[in-house]
């Protein structure tokens, strides 16, 4: 079982905590991680791209010149695709890019992401995380005490309004609950700061 240090909010080590082998101690699968990240990024795409076909472009209802006798090529509409300002053939239309990987693959991906943080020693487990009021300065002080000066993902067991509001104004810091932990967030942040309760909740779901 992986064993990591347990800290308090002041940044002092108060003990150690053993993490589940099944969640935090597996060999990271890079192929599965890649698939999960691509899936999440695809789901984030808006897919609102749109071009107009010849039937949707304004104008072009009448024949520009008669069929024969002008010496010019025959034309039926000034909005056909070969004309400047004409419709587009097989252009993009609004669509959803989202898709889902199998549940087992998604679970393996998040386990791989969490295990990679443990392996790289980029995880900080807190005894608890509570603020009396939403204060960005106080949250910044906690992170500084934990020697976190880069992008960090803060995870608590349940939604905490004070923590969420305190973290959102700090550049590079993202707050999520244990239920919202996902591969993309874990990978793109340099540090994973997670409370003891959140660890237990994640292990309960994924183990």
Swiss-Prot record:
GO terms for biological process: translation. Residues 44-78 are annotated as: Disordered. SUPFAM superfamilies: Ribosomal protein L4 (SSF52166). Keywords: Ribonucleoprotein, Ribosomal protein, RNA-binding, rRNA-binding. Signal peptide: none annotated. It holds the Pfam family Ribosomal_L4. GO terms for molecular function: rRNA binding; structural constituent of ribosome. Residues 60-71 have a biased composition (Basic residues). GO terms for cellular component: ribonucleoprotein complex; ribosome. InterPro entries: Ribosomal_uL4 (IPR002136), Ribosomal_uL4-like (IPR013005), Ribosomal_uL4_dom_sf (IPR023574). Belongs to the universal ribosomal protein uL4 family. Part of the 50S ribosomal subunit. One of the primary rRNA binding proteins, this protein initially binds near the 5'-end of the 23S rRNA. It is important during the early stages of 50S assembly. It makes multiple contacts with different domains of the 23S rRNA in the assembled 50S subunit and ribosome. Forms part of the polypeptide exit tunnel. This is Large ribosomal subunit protein uL4. It comes from Halalkalibacterium halodurans (strain ATCC BAA-125 / DSM 18197 / FERM 7344 / JCM 9153 / C-125) (Bacillus halodurans). The lineage of its organism: Bacteria, Bacillati, Bacillota, Bacilli, Bacillales.
């Amino acid at each position: 079982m992986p064993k990591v240090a347990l800290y308090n909010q002041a940044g002092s080590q108060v003990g150690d905590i053993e993490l589940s082998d099944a969640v935090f101690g597996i060999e990271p699968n890079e192929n599965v991680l890649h698939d999960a990240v691509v899936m999440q990024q695809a789901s984030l795409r808006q897919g609102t791209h749109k071009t107009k076909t010849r039937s949707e472009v304004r104008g072009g209802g009448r024949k520009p010149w008669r069929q024969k006798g002008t010496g010019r090529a025959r034309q039926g509409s000034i909005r056909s695709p070969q004309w400047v300002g004409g419709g587009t053939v097989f252009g993009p239309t609004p669509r959803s890019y989202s898709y889902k990987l199998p549940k087992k693959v998604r679970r393996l991906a998040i386990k791989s992401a969490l295990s990679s943080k443990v392996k790289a020693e980029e995880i900080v487990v807190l005894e608890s995380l509570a603020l009396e009021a939403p204060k960005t300065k106080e949250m910044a002080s906690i992170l500084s005490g934990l020697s976190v000066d880069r992008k960090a993902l803060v995870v608590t067991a349940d939604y905490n309004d004070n923590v969420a509001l305190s973290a959102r104004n700090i550049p590079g810091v993202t707050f999520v609950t244990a239920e919202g932990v996902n591969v993309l967030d874990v990978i793109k942040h340099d540090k994973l700061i997670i409370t003891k309760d959140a660890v237990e909740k994640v292990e309960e779901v994924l183990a």
